[in-house]
């Protein structure tokens, strides 16, 4: 150890940590008690890591006693200590773990935390729960010794701009054989957390199912265990009540909401494993992070191995819980887990069970299923694109807003097909209101044809796959040809007005001449009944919605669209009048108004305004 290492040093916090600490120190959150849940959770993680490392290094467990967490309240001065004899931290780990946040999405998290009325759930979700202790403490001292090390270190902070790190005193180093001691110097208003009944209440509410004993160590008397320390997933369903599952979910998932779905079973046969999984009822803030990380923990015979083993496909990353295998070797590395044949089979089987449970919930408990779909529907639909094997099931599971209503299934859609209708029609956009008024719906509406209205960003991707449901292919109303000739219009939509005398070839030639290279083609529309024009994509390649999205992400430019025109519209008919001096302006306006109706801006806003002004002035 160098002289520099042994001398106390003051170091600044990473900018994001300083911002987070400022939020904690000046917290207005009502649930300040969650600090204890977070510290206990961190202690449990440290004990899990110790058990895992001890598989290959058994000597790590020789000193330090039975794995446990202790809570020690002391008055005068008011301090609350949370102690674990887990893996511990060395000097650099203290700096890295308590002085920085090495995670993507930090800025997004801090923004949401600043805006939240109660950020307690967000704090747990993001894994920065240690800093929640500054909601109740004006000074925190952390002393830690890594398992197998002879050195102990002390980290101290008052929640300001930085922290001090120094070697632990001889007395502290002797006291902490292995693990971490966190001493909170409580603010006056937080003194209630020194009361035994408060500590027991919080542990019962949030941490009862932590696998390790949690002991309350009073100033007088003996330490006593205050949690059940039971791996509930290893017990049979008949032994557990609904409240047990709620508490297990909150403990395993570090959550505050109640689960909208619970799946608990034991698989026996070629492989034996216990499963306890939950679907949350609220959406976590990091659902759409690029890493799409899962949240299912892998245990082997109750020993935590990893929470990063891709135990479910990415489109089920909202599922929380535990899979505990009886057969996997304890010393299997995290890297080897990815290709382990047992785990591949477990993943396949559990994925099928989760989808089956979602199907069952949709039929038996639509209200709870609606909570899941509202929060996680866009994520589940990623699987339609990614999981060919389960595509049909995921399509059947999906709920849609359509021109007939909300929460419609494709089964509902197929049951209500119009006579001679052979396709399932959809329209993709970024706004439900804009889609409802989209001119591409007009001919379908006149025939009573239901159309799926898709507004989630993922919809532009999964609909680009070749899809069918019940033998009926899915067809975009903004791409390729549409033929409704064999589907009669409804009585209400019948229009007895004669078609204007329009020279179709002349009109199309005039518009093409005016638009030049702006479009790939101009043609008469079967989609339109009232509007003058619309833009569509060709039959090959991506839908217009996907083209726009890819262009916004600089992942390719949009191809030239096709302009469809309604030959029955007076504006279109006017273009075909011989000698019409406004034909070029009208042709450009047909394109520009179609762009606006699709949510795009005209390429030349000044030119667009000039054309409008000229035509209005001529009409005065």
UniProtKB/Swiss-Prot annotation:
Residues 549-620 are annotated as: C. Pfam families: HATPase_c_3, HSP90. It comes from the Bacteria. The keyword Chaperone applies. It is found in: Cytoplasm. Gene3D superfamilies: 3.30.230.80, 3.40.50.11260, Heat shock protein 90, C-terminal domain (1.20.120.790), Histidine kinase-like ATPase, C-terminal domain (3.30.565.10). Keywords: ATP-binding, Chaperone, Cytoplasm, Nucleotide-binding, Stress response. GO terms for cellular component: cytoplasm. InterPro entries: HATPase_C_sf, HSP90_C, Hsp90_fam, Hsp90_N, Ribosomal_Su5_D2-typ_SF. Residues 1-334 are annotated as: A. One of its GO terms (molecular function) is ATP-dependent protein folding chaperone. Residues 335-548 are annotated as: B. Its main location: cytoplasm. The keyword Protein biosynthesis does not apply. Belongs to the heat shock protein 90 family. HAMAP family: HSP90. Homodimer. Molecular chaperone. Has ATPase activity. PANTHER family: HEAT SHOCK PROTEIN 90 FAMILY MEMBER. This is Chaperone protein HtpG. The gene is htpG.
């Amino acid at each position: 150890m160098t002289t520099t290492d042994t001398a106390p040093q003051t170091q600044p916090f990473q900018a994001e940590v300083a911002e987070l600490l400022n939020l904690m120190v000046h917290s207005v959150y009502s649930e300040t008690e969650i600090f204890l849940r977070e510290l206990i959770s961190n202690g449990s993680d440290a004990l899990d890591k110790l058990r895992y490392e001890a598989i290959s290094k058994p000597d790590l467990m020789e000193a330090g006693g039975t794995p446990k967490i202790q809570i020690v309240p002391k008055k005068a001065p008011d301090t609350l200590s949370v102690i674990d004899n887990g893996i511990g931290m060395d000097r650099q780990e203290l700096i890295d773990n308590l002085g920085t946040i090495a995670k993507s999405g930090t800025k997004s998290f801090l923004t949401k935390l600043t805006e939240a009325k109660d950020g307690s759930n967000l704090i747990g979700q993001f894994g920065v729960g240690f800093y929640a202790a500054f909601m109740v403490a004006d000074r925190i001292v952390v002393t830690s010794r890594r398992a197998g090390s002879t050195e102990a270190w002390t980290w101290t902070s008052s929640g300001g701009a930085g922290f001090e790190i120094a070697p632990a005193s001889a007395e502290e180093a002797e006291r902490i054989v292995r693990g971490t001691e966190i001493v909170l110097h409580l603010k006056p208003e937080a003194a209630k957390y020194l009361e035994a009944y408060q500590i027991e209440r919080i542990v019962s509410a949030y941490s009862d199912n932590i696998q390790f004993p949690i002991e309350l160590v009073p100033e007088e008397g003996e330490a006593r265990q205050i949690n059940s320390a039971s791996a509930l997933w290893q017990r049979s369903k008949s032994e557990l009540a609904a409240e047990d599952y709620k508490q297990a979910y909150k403990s395993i998932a570090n959550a505050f909401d109640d689960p909208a779905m619970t799946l608990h079973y034991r698989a026996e046969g070629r492989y034996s494993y216990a499963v306890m999984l939950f679907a949350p009822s609220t959406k976590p803030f990091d659902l759409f992070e690029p890493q799409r990380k899962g949240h299912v923990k892998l245990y082997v015979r109750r020993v935590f191995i990893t929470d990063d083993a891709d135990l479910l496909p990415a489109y089920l990353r909202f599922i929380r819980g535990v899979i505990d295998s009886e057969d996997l070797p304890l010393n299997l590395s995290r890297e080897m887990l990815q290709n382990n044949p047992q785990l591949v089979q477990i993943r396949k089987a559990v994925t099928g069970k989760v989808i089956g449970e979602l199907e069952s919930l949709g039929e038996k408990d639509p209200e709870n299923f609606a909570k899941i779909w509202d929060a996680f529907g866009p994520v589940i639909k990623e699987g339609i694109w990614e999981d060919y094997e389960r595509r049909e099931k995921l399509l059947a599971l999906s709920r849609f807003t359509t021109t007939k209503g909300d929460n419609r299934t494709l089964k509902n859609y197929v049951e209500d097909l119009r006579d001679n209708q052979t396709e399932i029609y959809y329209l993709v956009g970024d706004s439900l209101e804009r889609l409802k008024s989209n001119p591409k719906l007009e001919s379908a509406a006149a025939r009573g044809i239901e159309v799926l209205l898709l507004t989630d960003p993922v919809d532009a991707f999964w609909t680009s796959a070749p899809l069918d449901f019940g033998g009926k292919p899915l067809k975009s109303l903004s791409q390729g040809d549409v033929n409704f000739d064999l589907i009669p219009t409804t009585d209400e939509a019948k229009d007895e007005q004669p078609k204007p005398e329009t020279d179709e070839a002349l009109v199309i030639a005039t518009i093409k001449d005016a638009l030049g290279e702006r479009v790939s083609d101009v043609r008469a529309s079967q989609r339109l009944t009232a509007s003058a024009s619309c833009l569509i994509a060709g039959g090959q390649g991506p839908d217009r919605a996907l083209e726009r999205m890819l262009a916004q992400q600089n992942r390719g430019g949009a191809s030239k669209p096709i302009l469809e025109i309604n030959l029955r519209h007076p504006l279109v008919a006017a273009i075909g009048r011989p000698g019409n001096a406004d034909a070029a302006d009208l042709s450009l306006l047909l394109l520009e108004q179609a762009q606006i109706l699709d949510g795009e801006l005209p390429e030349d806003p000044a030119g667009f305004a000039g054309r409008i002004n000229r035509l209005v002035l001529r009409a005065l």
